[in-house]
Every structure is written in structure tokens, then in C-alpha cells.
């Protein structure tokens, strides 16, 4: 019914986001993966949407990428997997790692995700492997995605660490982006240390 929503990000947490569009505020349930990629509140943002309808409620799920939405919809096709568990899977692993776990028949990668035990992991792989292969152009493998995702994950982790330390997200994003533009071959710890030094000097 809905392809995506583009509007002003009013607020968000690790599992929820509110977007205002033409005077109407929409509440989205999101994964931790999407939450880590959202900009500051007050910024314009676009979320790919999935409307889930049940007898007592209509729920909007939002995704930062079309890939994540496609995988969410695929997970819903597995027996015993509802929106809550599907979102938990997407919060526990990056999209390409979930894809590879299913395609390569490695249920161990799904263990440890909240709500996913051995039987559930095995069932997801058994029921979805053939289906996910048809989505491979939309959901590329880790090999194809690794360079981009490694850099993106490094950036996201560094920004999250700085925000956790109390720095404004905007300042953290700007500083981390600048540092990685200069040198992308570094660890999260190195980026955070350099960022802390830059932010400290800027405040002097």
C-alpha cells in the first residue's frame, strides 16, 4: 500500500521512529539497524514502509533501505515468524549476513538473536533458502557488499560510540565522516580517539 514516507524526523529510539509529513505524524516500528542510520531529529528522512494489518491494529514498519524491507517481508513468510521476530533478526545482524546465513545454510549465524533458537533458525533456512535466491539481485551476498558495509559499519559504530559518550549526533557524524574521508583504513577505537581529540580541540 505504501512505498515509502519522506518527511521530518521528529524523534526516534532503537526501535521506534516518528516522522511528520504534511502535518501528520506517523509512528514506525524500526530495527536497530535502521535506527543507527537515522540522522538527527529535525532532519528530513525517508523510510521504506510496510503496513501490517491485524484484527486489533494497523502497524507501520519502517526501513532505511529497500533491501532491509525485502528481507523483512521474506522473513514473514517463514512459519512462526511474525513482525516482531523478523525485526529482531534484522536488529541482530546486517542484511547481507542474514542473507548469507540462509543461502549458505549456516543456522549458527542466527543463534543468539533474541527469539531465535536452533529450531527457528533451521526452519527459517529450510523454508526461505529457495525464495531468497530469487531475491539475490536485490539482496546481494556479503562478498559483494563487504567493502561498502564494512565502511558503513565502521562509521555507524564510531558515531554510536560518540553519541553514547554524550556528544551531539550532528557533531559526531560530521567528525567521523571527515576522519574516514582522510583515512578509511582504521579501527573504531582509532576513529573514536581521533574524533574525541578533534571535538575537544574545537571546544577550546
UniProtKB/Swiss-Prot annotation:
Pfam family, one: HHH_5
Superkingdom of origin organism: Bacteria
Keywords per UniProt: Cytoplasm, DNA damage, DNA recombination, DNA repair, DNA-binding
Residue ranges of the region described as Domain II: 65-143
Molecular functions (GO terms): ATP binding; four-way junction DNA binding; four-way junction helicase activity
Keyword Cytoplasm: yes
Positions of region (Flexible linker): 144-149
Cellular location(s): Cytoplasm
Ranges for region Domain I: 1-64
InterPro entries per UniProt: DNA_helicase_Holl-junc_RuvA_I, Hlx-hairpin-Hlx_DNA-bd_motif, NA-bd_OB-fold, RuvA, RuvA_2-like, RuvA_C, RuvA_C_sf
Domain-level remarks: Has three domains with a flexible linker between the domains II and III and assumes an 'L' shape. Domain III is highly mobile and contacts RuvB.
Subunit relationships: Homotetramer. Forms an RuvA(8)-RuvB(12)-Holliday junction (HJ) complex. HJ DNA is sandwiched between 2 RuvA tetramers; dsDNA enters through RuvA and exits via RuvB. An RuvB hexamer assembles on each DNA strand where it exits the tetramer. Each RuvB hexamer is contacted by two RuvA subunits (via domain III) on 2 adjacent RuvB subunits; this complex drives branch migration. In the full resolvosome a probable DNA-RuvA(4)-RuvB(12)-RuvC(2) complex forms which resolves the HJ.
Family the entry assigns: Belongs to the RuvA family.
Function comment: The RuvA-RuvB-RuvC complex processes Holliday junction (HJ) DNA during genetic recombination and DNA repair, while the RuvA-RuvB complex plays an important role in the rescue of blocked DNA replication forks via replication fork reversal (RFR). RuvA specifically binds to HJ cruciform DNA, conferring on it an open structure. The RuvB hexamer acts as an ATP-dependent pump, pulling dsDNA into and through the RuvAB complex. HJ branch migration allows RuvC to scan DNA until it finds its consensus sequence, where it cleaves and resolves the cruciform DNA.
Name of the molecule in the record: Holliday junction branch migration complex subunit RuvA
Organism, scientific name: Chlorobium chlorochromatii (strain CaD3)
Species lineage: Bacteria, Pseudomonadati, Chlorobiota, Chlorobiia, Chlorobiales
Gene designation: ruvA
